[in-house]
Swiss-Prot record:
InterPro entries documented for this protein: Wnt, Wnt8, Wnt_C, Wnt_CS
Protein name: Protein Wnt-8b
Tissue: Expression is restricted to the brain, and more specifically to the forebrain.
Main location: secreted
One Pfam family here: wnt
GO cellular component, one term: extracellular region
Signal peptide extent: 1-22
GO-annotated biological processes: canonical Wnt signaling pathway; cell fate commitment; cellular response to retinoic acid; determination of dorsal identity; gastrulation; nervous system development; neuron differentiation; response to estradiol
Keywords: Developmental protein, Disulfide bond, Extracellular matrix, Glycoprotein, Lipoprotein, Secreted, Signal, Wnt signaling pathway
Length: 351
């Protein structure tokens, strides 16, 4: 007997977002509608890319996308309804849609190909739609059925999660790139044909990180929705907010501090960055953000690293390298005595 679609989706996504890297889709999707099983590996890969992007975007934040945050299932994991939960839902939804769209364009699915629905139509002054646009409509439709099926409730929390799932999909569509090819005599560009391509997924992650910082707090009772009137009020409230924006119901906790009840480790012991030509402003200020503003000192530790260097190709056919040792300095947040005049942590500061 086949499982119902929602049951299959819930099984799939709950298992995909476990942090063990040894999972296999085939282990938990042995049955189900065959029409949807063909997408399961793409959904798994998309969910994993969302996890990795979350960790990248928040690597130097007080909340750094910890393992317990990476389950979308309401059966345990994301108990809070704060802006971090909003981001996890959005980036996971975006990752699934992005991967399905990309794999469609690569020809991985027999029932999907380029989006040429607008080919030949005037797109703007001097250019027409043409070529092979990535089929985001397909990726959006399939990912919506997989991801949104996790939400079986009708309360404010479920509405929030569905809204942020949609914001993730909108982020993929909103960051698509227009690529054009010139046509004309002797290399002139009299007219152009253009198509839409997916950006690097890193751009989608950066876009959603900006939305995270601007996330809107919705003032609703989370238990609302048990009555027709309550559900109507929730629906009206969320309809008034653009689906391009992230929303949350609760304020974030103080991520500086350890909180075993919430599963928060605090920032003590976290590594931070101070120097490096390639560092951006956010990374260079990580010691202040993770340590100083949390009432911790910055501890300097020296370590020796070993890496391959002076590699040479020898005919035929081997590459031989030397092992070079290098002393490096790393910085960590420590409970050690702070220098005089250091700022004390102020609870409730923005994470």
């Amino acid at each position: 007997m086949f499982l119902s679609k929602p049951s299959v989706y819930i099984c799939l996504f709950t298992c995909v977002l476990q942090l063990s890297h040894s999972w296999s889709v085939n282990n938990f999707l042995m049955t189900g509608p065959k029409a949807y099983l063909i997408y399961s590996s793409s959904v798994a890969a998309g969910a994993q890319s969302g996890i990795e992007e979350c960790k990248y975007q928040f690597a130097w934040d007080r909340w750094n996308c910890p393992e317990r945050a990476l389950q979308l299932s309401s059966h345990g994991g994301l108990r809070s309804a704060n802006r971090e939960t909003a981001f996890v839902h959005a980036i996971s939804s975006a990752g699934v849609m992005y991967t399905l769209t990309r794999n469609c364009s690569l020809g991985d699915f027999d029932n999907c190909g380029c989006d040429d629905s607008r080919n030949g139509q005037l797109g703007g002054q001097g250019w027409l739609w043409g070529g092979c646009s990535d089929n985001v409509g397909f990726g959006e439709a399939i990912s919506k059925q997989f991801v949104d099926a996790l939400e079986t409730g009708q309360d404010a929390r479920a509405a929030m999660n569905l809204h942020n799932n949609e914001a993730g999909r909108k982020a993929v569509k909103g960051t698509m790139k227009r690529t054009c090819k010139c046509h004309g005599v002797s290399g002139s560009c009299t007219t152009q044909t253009c198509w839409l391509q997916l950006p690097e997924f890193r751009e989608v992650g950066a876009h959603l990180k900006e939305k995270y910082h601007a996330a809107l707090k919705v003032d609703l009772l989370q238990g609302a929705g048990n009555s027709a009137a309550g559900r109507g009020a929730i629906a009206d409230t969320f309809r008034s907010i653009s689906t391009r924006e992230l929303v949350h119901l609760e304020d974030s906790p103080d991520y500086c501090l350890e909180n075993k009840t919430l599963g928060l480790l605090g920032t003590e012991g976290r590594e931070c960055l101070r120097r490096g030509r390639a560092l951006g402003r956010w990374e260079r200020r990580s010691c202040r953000r993770l340590c100083g503003d949390c009432g911790l000192a910055v501890e300097e530790r020296r370590a020796e690293t070993v890496s391959s260097c002076n590699c040479k190709f020898h005919w035929c056919c081997a590459v031989r390298c030397e092992q070079c040792r290098r002393r490096v300095t790393k910085y960590f947040c420590s409970r050690a005595e702070r220098p005089r005049g250091g700022a004390a942590h102020k609870p409730g500061r923005k994470p």
